Regions:
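Extended amphipathic ligand-handling, pore-lining, and cofactor/metal-binding catalytic surfaces
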Residues: 1-302
């Protein structure tokens, strides 16, 4: 992506990629320290973009990751690290916080779906049910006002429009754990129930994941297709985005647009969930709101 971005946005080049995870290495703390070691921030200034790889925003995913970023920014460059709320020469952060209906993302999903549909005999193709599967959320989070269900639905609808609304489809939810209520219908239940009704041609699309991992390779491939569908040849999974050239171009386009926008984040990022009581979430959003204000002042001055 950065190689492509260097070509399409030479005025902001060179672009250097870093990876940070919440629960695997390299952790956000380690990546932030690496940025400082590489000469970013720590009195040297410089710009960094936190580019979430969750297309659809949720407080449980992107929000949690940004809370972690804000925490380490505060500890390493903020008041706890320097004694100043806005230390001079700190990294100037901005964030690409959501992109559920970006045309490049939609095209990438549609291309992979069309490719998988070609594996069905022509006479069966129009009867394939598309099951868009996303990680579920507890209803307690949804009822707090989390935008995730609406943003996942926006992706699904945009992809179906790109496909000409030619196929039957449903949005289903996977990875529920524990006894509390979660978003439904569950992916596994849906596959089993449709098969009981005689619908055996189904195509699973991991619509909220951008790469393969345990929830695609194990949960969808082994548990849902291998066990719930008993390996029926009509139940297939669309490949994940992974290294799709269309997807990589979409990432570069998103980064370029963001770098030239002068915005620190989307307007939606600043809005808290109506039922949110997290002080860390509030502080994180206030931080990015300040960054956004600084960006606008600098743009106006220029």
């Amino acid at each position: 992506m950065c190689k492509l971005l260097d070509q399409t946005s030479p005025d902001t080049a060179p672009h250097k990629p870093y990876v940070a995870f919440r629960y695997a290495n390299p952790l956000t703390e380690d990546t932030y320290k690496q940025l400082l070691a590489d000469g970013f921030g720590g009195g040297n200034g410089g710009r960094a973009v936190a580019f979430t790889q969750y297309p659809q925003y949720s407080c449980s995913t992107t929000g949690s990751s940004l809370n972690e970023l804000w925490k380490w920014r505060t500890r390493l460059e903020g008041k706890r690290g320097t004694g100043e709320v806005e230390a001079k020469g700190a990294i100037n952060w901005s964030v690409i916080d959501r992109w559920p209906a970006h045309p490049g993302l939609v095209d990438a999903f549609a291309e992979l779906i069309e490719k998988k549909l070609l594996e069905y005999p022509a006479e069966r193709r129009s009867n394939v049910v598309l099951l868009f599967s996303a990680h579920s959320l507890p209803m307690s989070v949804v009822n707090r006002g989390d935008p995730y269900p609406a943003e996942v639905a926006a992706t699904v609808y945009a992809v179906m429009q790109r496909l000409g609304m030619k196929y039957k489809y449903r949005l289903v939810w996977q990875s529920q754990v524990g006894p509390q209520p979660w978003l439904g219908a569950q992916t596994s239940d849906t596959v089993k129930n449709l098969m009981k009704k005689g619908q055996t041609d189904m195509c699973l699309i991991p619509i909220a994941f951008t790469s393969d991992h345990i929830e695609t390779l194990y949960e969808l491939d082994k548990e849902v297709i291998g066990e719930d569908a008993q390996g029926h040849e009509g139940v297939k999974r669309v490949d994940s985005l992974n290294g799709s050239p269309t997807f990589i171009k979409a990432l570069a386009d998103l980064a370029k647009s963001h770098l030239h926008s002068g915005e620190a984040c989307s307007p939606q990022m600043i809005l808290r969930c109506p039922g949110c009581t997290s002080e860390r979430c509030l502080a994180q959003k206030e931080f990015f709101a300040r960054q956004s204000g600084q960006d606008k002042q600098e743009a106006a001055a220029a």
